[in-house]
């Protein structure tokens, strides 16, 4: 597994690198924190571990840059005790988040879970769903409508798949949150709202503004 570890604390970087390599992960770091994307593009990681507090530009900046060109899984690290860091990471499409200090074995378990969820699923036979006049490719986390294509994060796609399989039915927030936890995604009531809002914004880009309806106090409904 190719891991890009974007961490400016050299002591922590070396400790994590040594531990990850014992699990046969191939780990690369950053030499110039103004050129993170150069290393990202040349190393082509399968997962990125991204610290929030970095010199020159913060981790949120680099997450945006990565999301412009890739859906690679991103796990954020942060030493700040600030819930908004977690919310921001979700808004930017991160796959997981850990607050420092943390147990290395928990980090490794999260990396393995992300890898299984992303790469073992995408290696399966292509799966598609038809919804309204759009085609949803579950293996690529994409939606195509006419000549327009949008890409979703793994969490957004799970939410959408749950709603579509129960079209014209109200799906409770608790049902969605439970499904996401079962899939080893990290989510709370607040981050579910963030993900649904981000999903709606992406759907609006292809003219599907009212495809998902909020049922106040009950949950969400995907219309036929």
UniProtKB/Swiss-Prot annotation:
Residues carrying 4-aspartylphosphate: 51
Keywords linked to the UniProt accession: Activator, Antibiotic resistance, Cytoplasm, DNA-binding, Phosphoprotein, Repressor, Transcription, Transcription regulation, Two-component regulatory system, Virulence
Any one of the GO CC terms: cytosol
Modified residues (Phosphothreonine): 128, 130, 149
Domain Response regulatory: 2-115
Description of post-translational modifications: Phosphorylated by GraS. Phosphorylated by Stk1; phosphorylation increases the DNA-binding activity of GraR.
GO terms for biological process, alphabetical: regulation of DNA-templated transcription; response to antibiotic
Subcellular location: Cytoplasm
The keyword Zinc appears for this protein: no
Quaternary assembly: Interacts with GraX.
Protein name, as recorded: Response regulator protein GraR
Species name: Staphylococcus aureus (strain MRSA252)
